[in-house]
Amino acid sequence: MENLGVGEGAEACSRLSRSRGRHSMTRAPKHLWRQPRRPIRIQQRFYSDPDKSAGCRERDLSPRPELRKSRLSWPVSSCRRFDLENGLSCGRRALDPQSSPGLGRIMQAPVPHSQRRESFLYRSDSDYELSPKAMSRNSSVASDLHGEDMIVTPFAQVLASLRTVRSNVAALARQQCLGAAKQGPVGNPSSSNQLPPAEDTGQKLALETLDELDWCLDQLETLQTRHSVGEMASNKFKRILNRELTHLSETSRSGNQVSEYISRTFLDQQTEVELPKVTAEEAPQPMSRISGLHGLCHSASLSSATVPRFGVQTDQEEQLAKELEDTNKWGLDVFKVAELSGNRPLTAIIFSIFQERDLLKTFQIPADTLATYLLMLEGHYHANVAYHNSLHAADVAQSTHVLLATPALEAVFTDLEILAALFASAIHDVDHPGVSNQFLINTNSELALMYNDASVLENHHLAVGFKLLQAENCDIFQNLSAKQRLSLRRMVIDMVLATDMSKHMNLLADLKTMVETKKVTSLGVLLLDNYSDRIQVLQNLVHCADLSNPTKPLPLYRQWTDRIMAEFFQQGDRERESGLDISPMCDKHTASVEKSQVGFIDYIAHPLWETWADLVHPDAQDLLDTLEDNREWYQSKIPRSPSDLTNPERDGPDRFQFELTLEEAEEEDEEEEEEGEETALAKEALELPDTELLSPEAGPDPGDLPLDNQRT
């Protein structure tokens, strides 16, 4: 390109411009499943350093811990948050075809939101990466395209890095084009004066591009082809969480118990236990029917003339109506609804929601059939179970209803999808026995045998919920077409199975990867033009509703906490009586309620709701504020007892240890070897004479220094 004439240089620039235009105007492929009613626009969050606002066009190349160049502006208390609505960062170049005079309006977030903590997902994962190059990409690309938007999922980081490479190559080509155009006829003496600045800039961009390519190649070369890109984020988040929980387990005995509970419940950790012996009398019989069902043949069917206003008979109908006025609001007091509805909160709330959304008319659901089914369904929730009863189902269903109505999701989902989400939330814990999946597996229960230890309770809830439709006058889907019915069943199954808490980290990683990938590739537009993307959002929506207790007003949250702990303690008592090891947080003599809630918020609820808030920004900001306030309340209630403090270096038999897979163990060994080699090299470098240390040839690469020497 150095010998291009004026005409050829202009033609090359024109080709480059057309190429960039085609790249920026790339349209999404035609839908594979159905056309979405409206795409979701993901608003990008920016964390800007006030000291750098004047020079936002300049790329930060200052050394940082473990980084050769800046890839992330870590959130600190002094940082101010900015939201970019339908616009681009201040670093957008004027030549970028994606920029326009109408874009780029920066809106400062309200003050209460600016100081909110970030979840553990934004912490460094460098201690667990496979190579020094990978270690240089702990977070997002601070590029002109993305400003300082924080990106933490590996696949989105790869895409962002490749876009930076493309931008650099385009800039190099543009410089060559401009240089050729200015050079004019060969032999023009003035052209030599323009070369040095272009060469300096070109060398800088070339080195930066090589660095980006090296990191992308490293990520892609270590990607296991049989796993999805979402698993890259899932594995990364699990490694970070394991490290955080290990630190927590070293602080105290109660911290150790909280760590073990979170790991076993939300990380799908399998533990080996000694199962009780099965005697001849206890030997399970062949099963041909769903257990736990009763009253299918002689249900108390209602007639259309006798259907109460809210589906339940109550002498406090007016008070109930007043309470249900808050059905569309976050934080409905379902305990009060239960009192006013004769302990039928699920029936009253679902009946009210279906009327509010006009679903009875849309799907031709007879009111008496709906009321009969809901009463039958609620009757199969166990009133003697402290937490997983019809109160919880009603709360999750109402929370799902409110989340579906969030402005960011307006007109996104079809009526059938909304019906499926509400139905899934209503049945998601029906016939729950008040014990965990692991308890059923450990006790060789009938349900565990029937469902082969895989999402035992979730499969059972689905079976019961659908089986009840076969009772007399209970088929609320009788007027759906065969195609609609199959589609609804598929969605409900996917959503209820996703409420298995052992799948939490995979759900979270997939959602965060989706959100960040769309930020990088589509200017924040999430089209949801296929079933996989749409059901992923719905799964996370119901999962958020299922884990919404910490986002509710504190009086409600405390009642839910009391109930879940009572259920845990009941399971612990049963385990103690059966001679089994007591599950984490189920021993009423040692469990710390306050620490359990702080740990649950820090490592489970906060990362999930933070990611959901990114998807629907700014609609969930108040929920995050409530979550933070509730965490601080429980944190303030943790007893400061000296007897609870233990030696962090203790190695007692009750200390929780994370089990590593064979693959993770090999990675740990490789990291230890690399760290030892790097430490030895660093020591040799430090022993060199000062003159050699000042020499560029003798000095070690900053990226090769051990971690401790890079931290500032």
Swiss-Prot record:
Hydrolyzes the second messenger cAMP, which is a key regulator of many important physiological processes. It comes from Homo sapiens (Human). Zn(2+) 2 binds at residue 429. Keywords: cAMP, Cell projection, Cilium, Hydrolase, Manganese, Metal-binding, Phosphoprotein, Zinc. It catalyses: 3',5'-cyclic AMP + H2O = AMP + H(+). It is found in: Cell projection, Cilium. The gene is PDE4C. Part of a complex containing AKAP5, ADCY5, ADCY6 and PKD2. Zn(2+) 1 binds at residues 392, 428-429, 546. GO terms for cellular component: cilium; cytosol; extracellular space. The lineage of its organism: Eukaryota, Metazoa, Chordata, Craniata, Vertebrata. This is 3',5'-cyclic-AMP phosphodiesterase 4C. 3',5'-cyclic AMP binds at residues 388, 597, 600. GO terms for biological process: cAMP catabolic process; cAMP-mediated signaling. The modification Phosphoserine is found at residues 73, 641. Residues 1-31, 45-64, 181-200, 636-655, 664-712 are annotated as: Disordered. Inhibited by rolipram. Mn(2+) binds at residue 429. Residues 664-678 have a biased composition (Acidic residues). The keyword Membrane does not apply. Pathway: Purine metabolism; 3',5'-cyclic AMP degradation; AMP from 3',5'-cyclic AMP: step 1/1. One of its GO terms (molecular function) is 3',5'-cyclic-AMP phosphodiesterase activity. Binds 2 divalent metal cations per subunit. Site 1 may preferentially bind zinc ions. AMP binds at residues 388, 392, 429, 546, 597, 600. Belongs to the cyclic nucleotide phosphodiesterase family. PDE4 subfamily. Its EC number is 3.1.4.53.
